[in-house]
């Protein structure tokens, strides 16, 4: 699947309601109907209703990178999370909730405790599954470091979709002796797709 990152286009900067037709306009610009629109969203803030309305108007689904920037301990089975699920359900569109992705990388604050990560992923999944049948839980590690990926897998009951972030990198795991110049990037998917078919 291919997509486009339009968030840095100056026509679409600022509040999402400033350009209420941005997804429809983009579809018209490229002459294609897009199926999914991706947005980053900070855990602890309310469900992005305006964005969901734009996505619905464009005839698509929303992929929401739901990021607990304050750390995993901020994720609780509380009124906030239940309201988020109810608002996601009320959006009336498919929502792919990409919760705390790239967890195997040291650059995110939810890295470092696989047991706690799995508990929090399972918690969010249960609340979404119980309250919002239109929400699919997406587990999405980074392709590197590959050796840590499986430590963070929260289990089949919690994961509806599996994805992977793959970035252009000249070396595997930052090791200059492992050149990736002629490596097919799809081989990175083997780490998860061969284990979790």
Language model features with spans:
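Short, flexible, glycine/charge-rich loop motifs used to bind or transfer phosphoryl groups or to couple energy/partner
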Residues: 25-28, 151-153, 191-192
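Glycine-enriched alpha-helix->loop->beta-strand junction motifs that scaffold or abut catalytic
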Residues: 33, 60, 157-162, 197
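A general marker of short, structured functional hotspots
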Residues: 1, 8, 15, 19, ...
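Glycoside hydrolase catalytic-domain groove-lining segments
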Residues: 50-60, 65, 167-197
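N-terminal carbohydrate-binding/catalytic regions of secreted carbohydrate-active enzymes
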Residues: 2-94
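Active-site cleft segment of glycoside hydrolase catalytic domains centered on the general acid/base Glu
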Residues: 79-161, 165-187
